[in-house]
């Protein structure tokens, strides 16, 4: 299959088809017809039979231009993206339906990847133990309750959209009895720009090329004629339709996506209107995002997707709607869920993992040796153990006071605050100077460490007794490590694996720049906001705005009672040069909201929740080649998570669910058990 541009014409060869658009006029005919239909009719036509679509297209275009439109409509006969099944390895015709009795599987990490793996393993009869350091499952979808204005309200890490091409994730939800009534379809995909009018992309057709043309047709800033006048800038856009895993990563993983766009002289309006705001949703800035990963991202979400540009949103919080039912299903299948337990290291015997060392209650353990000279004379000194455990130490009354600085909610490092206590910037947990919980989601106080002197060094221990942590070994036949990047690095770093190349591949993994979520309760509605969710472009911090009081309970009810609204401002990836103290970032985001919605100038903030965190996967140029895959040098250790290298075109939450299933399939192959089908969007782009 190939595609080429020649003068003012466009040609494509695919399978046995040959279609040509001989002139700019033909393309403008399509655009005129597309623009005339409107967003509502896109939704209707998107699910039509192809011939019916063509018929209505020609009728709409009019008899006078029918001949030209007929030529271009032949594009619909070209290869259409269709759902496929990914092959994750050889399958046996006589495979068993269940695992051999008594096979023990330990899954580390209770996010979507870990839940996905645990569910599939348990369905086939494995004895599964799921270990999660946080007090609740869910990972980036987890949530908790806070008290806001006298009411208990659920909060989470930020807005999540659920796309139709999340095939494996949606199947996982369905297996837990989660039905469509927890979702509502988003009415459109609006983009707010700082320096130009807003763009709104309605539901797009699922039929190529009308899905692409509809985006151009709905845009105020784009038109086909401009693209063809700037034909050099069109070539790299066309090449994005030629996504092919091996070729794309060989050619483009060495440069960032902004460089790719600039070198290709892509039409600036297309970069600003489409590529930049959509690429930011990878949680990586274009300037540090691998061009190959960006091309895969666009292939998965739009250019190679048979599902169109549509997504769903939950009408209640994600814990209630999604995670709690998944946990119920896990327990129904017999999974032992160890939430609030931290996996420390892997025990190796030969080329196999024999077990997982886990922190439980009731013991003691040495954490850190430190010289007294390294502890500052006043205030808290922040230290990190060899295993990556953050510690806070200070001099007090001729002795020393020390805390394990991991928040008891999800293990994020806490920092001293102005009140003399401690603050978790990830989820707004607050602790007193004694480590007691003052507010937010942490379920327990910080762990106070014992400090002993010996041989001129300070030795920091977990305390003796119930407040401490004891190590226990979970023996296993198989282990799936489905932690995030930071957790995986810590566990592998703590384990004596004697596998330098694998250990380096994990150590080299990184997180994207920090993201910030700022949820605010306002005393007045934002009447001009007609959508529940907006992508934002051109501002220093804000990348999206979600109006929770427009789509999710209990915020809808709260707004109805008070006349106010609840808004969430989300910064996807804050550049190092833009990092500021919390109050400055909050003030800047409020000012950006005022610029987007002028009526908010006079509103009062009644309550707020601000969190900043860095746990999304980094997709930097050059990362891909060294990224570890699902299989490891150990025959019974498998990896899962959105950060794991896979050939399939998957991303974000779908990548987590997909790799969880891949890890389960690797176990099934080893035991001669039937594997789980893995649906995906097409492996290759339409011009590959």
Predicted regions and their residues:
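FAD-binding beta-loop-beta segment adjacent to the flavin cofactor pocket
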Residues: 557-561, 613-639, 643-647
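Helical element adjacent to the flavin cofactor pocket in flavoenzyme catalytic cores
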Residues: 300-363, 452, 464-474
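Extreme N-terminal leader/targeting segments of oxidoreductases
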Residues: 47-105, 123, 688
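N-terminal pre-ligand scaffold of iron-sulfur
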Residues: 361-419, 445-468
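N-terminal Rossmann-like FAD-binding beta1-loop-alpha1 element of flavoenzymes
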Residues: 103-130
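Mid-domain catalytic core of redox enzymes
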Residues: 341-364, 373, 469-565, 576-578, ...
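Glycine-rich FAD pyrophosphate-binding loop
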Residues: 122-145
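Mobile amphipathic helical/loop "lid" adjacent to a hydrophobic cofactor/ligand pocket
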Residues: 174-175, 180-295
């Amino acid at each position: 299959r190939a595609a080429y541009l020649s003068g003012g014409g466009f040609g494509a060869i695919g399978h046995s088809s040959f279609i040509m658009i001989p002139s700019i006029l033909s393309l403008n005919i399509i655009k005129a017809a597309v623009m005339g239909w409107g967003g509502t009719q896109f939704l209707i036509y998107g699910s039509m039979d192809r011939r019916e679509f063509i018929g209505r297209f020609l009728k709409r275009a009019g008899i006078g231009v029918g001949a030209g439109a007929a030529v271009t409509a032949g594009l619909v006969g070209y290869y259409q993206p269709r759902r496929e099944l990914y092959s994750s390895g050889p399958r046996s015709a006589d495979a068993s339906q269940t695992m051999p009795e008594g096979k023990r599987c330990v899954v580390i990490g209770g996010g979507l990847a870990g839940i996905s793996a645990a569910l599939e393993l348990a369905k086939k009869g494995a004895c599964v133990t799921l270990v999660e350091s946080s007090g609740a499952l869910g990972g980036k979808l987890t949530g908790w309750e806070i008290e806001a204005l006298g009411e208990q309200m659920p909060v989470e890490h930020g807005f999540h959209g659920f796309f139709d091409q999340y095939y494996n994730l949606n199947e996982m939800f369905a297996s837990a009895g989660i039905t469509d009534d927890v979702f509502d379809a988003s009415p459109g995909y609006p983009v707010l720009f700082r320096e130009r009018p807003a763009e709104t992309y309605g539901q797009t057709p699922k039929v190529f090329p009308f899905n692409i043309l509809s985006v151009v047709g709905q845009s105020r800033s784009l038109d086909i004629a401009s693209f063809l006048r700037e034909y050099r800038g069109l070539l790299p856009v066309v090449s994005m339709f030629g996504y092919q895993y091996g070729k794309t990563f060989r050619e483009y993983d060495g440069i960032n996506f902004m460089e790719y766009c600039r070198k290709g002289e892509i039409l600036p309006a297309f970069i600003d209107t489409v590529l930049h705001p959509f690429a930011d949703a990878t949680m990586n800035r274009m300037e540090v995002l691998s061009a190959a990963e960006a091309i895969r991202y666009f292939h998965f979400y739009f250019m190679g997707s048979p599902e169109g540009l549509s997504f769903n949103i939950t009408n209640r919080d994600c814990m209630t709607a999604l995670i709690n039912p998944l946990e119920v299903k896990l327990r129904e299948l017999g999974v032992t869920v160890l939430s609030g337990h931290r996996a420390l290291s892997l025990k190796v015997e030969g080329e196999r993992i024999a077990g997982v060392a886990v922190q439980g209650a009731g013991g003691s353990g040495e954490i850190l040796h430190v010289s007294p000279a390294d502890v500052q004379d006043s205030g808290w000194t922040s230290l990190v153990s060899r295993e990556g455990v953050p510690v806070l130490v200070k001099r007090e009354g001729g002795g020393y006071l020390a805390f394990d600085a991991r928040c008891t909610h999800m293990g994020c490092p806490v920092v001293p605050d102005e009140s003399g206590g401690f603050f978790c910037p990830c989820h707004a947990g607050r602790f007193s100077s004694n480590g007691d919980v003052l507010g937010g989601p942490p379920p327990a106080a910080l762990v106070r460490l014992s400090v002993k002197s010996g041989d001129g060094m300070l030795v920091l221990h977990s305390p003796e007794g119930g407040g401490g942590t004891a190590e226990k070994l979970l023996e296993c036949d198989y282990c799936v490590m489905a932690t995030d990047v930071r957790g995986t690095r810590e566990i592998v770093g703590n384990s004596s694996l004697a596998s330098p190349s694998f250990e380096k591949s994990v150590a080299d993994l990184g997180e994207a720049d920090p993201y910030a979520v700022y949820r605010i309760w306002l005393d007045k509605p934002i009447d001009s906001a007609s959508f529940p969710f907006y992508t934002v472009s051109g501002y220093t911090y804000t990348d999206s705005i979600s109006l929770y009081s427009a789509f999710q309970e209990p915020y809808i009810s709260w707004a109805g009672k008070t006349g106010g609204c609840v808004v969430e401002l989300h910064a996807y990836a804050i550049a190092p040069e833009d990092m500021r103290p919390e109050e400055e970032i909050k003030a800047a985001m409020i000012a950006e909201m005022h610029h987007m919605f002028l009526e908010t100038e006079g509103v009062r903030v009644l309550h707020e929740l601000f969190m900043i965190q860095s746990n999304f996967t980094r997709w930097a140029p050059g990362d891909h080649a060294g990224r570890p895959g699902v299989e490891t040098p150990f025959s019974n250790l498998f990896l899962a998570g959105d950060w794991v290298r896979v050939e399939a075109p998957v991303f974000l939450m779908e990548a987590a669910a997909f790799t969880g299933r891949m890890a389960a399939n690797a176990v099934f192959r080893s035991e001669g058990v039937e594997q789980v089908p893995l649906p995906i969007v097409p492996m290759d782009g339409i011009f590959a």
